[in-house]
């Protein structure tokens, strides 16, 4: 079911303590970033399991971001933060900050003329290279098989190091450590395979 737009979401987010409103905002090293956080299910669970680390989620839709913000407040998480913006506008202040970036079920932009909007296009890869720490990693999950294959080709073309990959995460050796998004849970329950790749800029 499609989420109904909350016209007051932006205003409500202004009063949420875990929403980053002013930049630059200092984030400690050894932090994790999720781009396209959605309702925050995966990132909030990771924050609960790893209270010694900082977790930041980017979500451009206020209605969805507010759900995550309220959930984090209820759980009294002090290591979880939200940026409500588009990825291209939000990352200028985080050079060398993140040890791990998650790209979770981002828009595959299936039309060929939109390929430059895909979050594994070279323009975005350059952004990630700047905000990752020296030994930082990127992990991607997607249910879109065509986007996954295109991503693998983009990574190879741009000289990145593919560390691990699978076209069926649920049946792979990586499943035991996988924390699911709400979107992911839905598609796994329907029998849809989930593609996964882990990569870095360091050879």
UniProtKB/Swiss-Prot annotation:
PROSITE patterns assigned to the protein according to its UniProt record, in alphabetical order: SAM_MT_TRMB (PS51625)
Residues involved in S-adenosyl-L-methionine binding: 34, 59, 86, 107
GO cellular component, one term: tRNA methyltransferase complex
Catalytic machinery residues: 107
Cited Gene3D superfamilies: Vaccinia Virus protein VP39
Entry similarity comment: Belongs to the class I-like SAM-binding methyltransferase superfamily. TrmB family.
Protein name: tRNA (guanine-N(7)-)-methyltransferase
Gene: trmB
């Amino acid at each position: 079911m499609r989420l109904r737009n909350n016209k007051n979401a932006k205003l409500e987010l202004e009063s949420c303590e875990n929403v980053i409103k002013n930049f630059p905002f200092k984030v400690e090293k050894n932090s994790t970033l999720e781009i396209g956080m959605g309702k925050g299910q995966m990132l909030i669970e990771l924050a609960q399991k790893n209270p010694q680390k900082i977790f930041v989620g980017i979500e451009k839709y206020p209605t969805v971001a507010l759900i995550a913000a309220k959930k984090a407040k209820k759980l009294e998480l002090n290591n979880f933060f939200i940026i409500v913006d588009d990825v291209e506008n939000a990352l200028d202040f985080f050079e060398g900050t993140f040890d791990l970036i998650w790209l979770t079920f981002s828009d595959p932009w299936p039309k060929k003329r939109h390929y430059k909007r895909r979050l594994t296009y070279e323009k975005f890869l350059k952004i990630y290279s700047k905000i990752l720490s020296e030994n930082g990693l990127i992990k991607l999950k997607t249910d879109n098989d065509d986007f996954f294959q295109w991503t693998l080709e983009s990574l190879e073309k741009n000289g990145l190091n593919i560390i691990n990959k699978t076209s069926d995460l649920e049946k792979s050796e990586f499943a035991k450590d996988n924390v699911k998004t709400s979107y992911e849970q839905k598609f796994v329950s329907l029998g849809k395979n989930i593609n996964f790749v882990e990569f870095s800029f360091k050879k």
